[in-house]
Design a protein with these regions (language model features):
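Metal- or metallocofactor-binding catalytic centers and their adjacent structured scaffolds
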Residues: 2-82
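Short, electropositive, low-hydrophobicity segments enriched in small/polar residues
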Residues: 11-13, 88, 96, 139
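Active-site-proximal flexible loops/turns
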Residues: 17, 79, 91, 138-140, ...
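Secondary-structure boundary/capping residues
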Residues: 36, 88, 96, 165-166
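Generic structural signal for individual residues within well-ordered alpha-helical segments
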Residues: 46-49, 91, 115, 180
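Glycine-rich, aromatic-flanked loop segments that form ligand/cofactor-binding clefts
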Residues: 66, 72-108
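Metal-dependent enolase-superfamily TIM-barrel catalytic cores that perform enediolate-based chemistry
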Residues: 97-197
Length: 197
């Protein structure tokens, strides 16, 4: 702002250099100098987002949206700083503890090794919620290797035991029929979260 106030924003780290260029080239020209009313920041941001989408209609897609996400989080941070309040209180919540889960990004690991890894995180770091990978990333229905999904869906939950939350991420591997089939396996093994089937 003109008085030196600022807010920090966050965007996806994937190809952040491209998103930063889009922010400066395709978002900033339409938002610089715009006023955000602290009384109704959501409406003002939606107007700004609509303006960017109208002016940059030839460039729809994830990079413009990622840049807008960075702007959105920066504006909320700015409003929180100006009000002297945490952002959570501005959006109707209350600051408090945030539960974390241990997330594995690995698919090149055997189900037994993954189970051992996650059990160590439980025992050494105190995690009580875990997410691991099934399928192959954007795998067109193929597994990382034949039978891995079936094996890991049984092995990891059995090793972790009861009293912990178990989640999986398929990263858009499965088509509808296989996604449903895997979903039933997950349900049978106490896995309660199924991300990007």
């Amino acid at each position: 702002t003109e008085d030196g106030a600022f807010g920090w924003g966050q965007m996806s780290t994937y190809h952040a250099d491209i998103t930063a260029q889009v922010l400066h080239r395709q978002v900033a020209p339409w938002v610089t100098g715009r006023f955000i009313d602290a009384g109704d920041p959501v409406a003002d941001f939606l107007d700004i987002a609509a303006l960017v989408h109208e002016r940059e209609h030839k460039f729809p897609g994830s990079y413009v949206r990622r840049a807008l996400a960075g702007l959105d989080t920066a504006l909320w941070d700015l409003l929180g700083r100006q009000a002297g309040k945490p952002v959570t209180s501005l959006i109707g919540g209350a600051p408090g503890r945030l539960r974390a889960y241990a997330s594995s990004m690995k698919r090149d690991i055997t189900p037994a090794d993954e189970a051992n890894r996650l059990c160590r995180l439980r025992d050494e770091k105190g995690f009580d919620a875990f997410k691991f990978r099934v399928g192959a990333e954007c795998g067109r229905g193929m597994d990382e290797w034949p039978g891995r999904t079936e094996e890991i869906v049984e092995t990891v939950p059995r090793a972790l035991g009861d009293g912990v939350v178990k989640m999986v991420d398929a990263n858009s591997c499965f088509g509808v029929e296989r996604a449903i089939e895997v979903g039933r396996m997950l349900e049978a093994n106490g896995i309660t979260h199924y991300e990007e089937p």
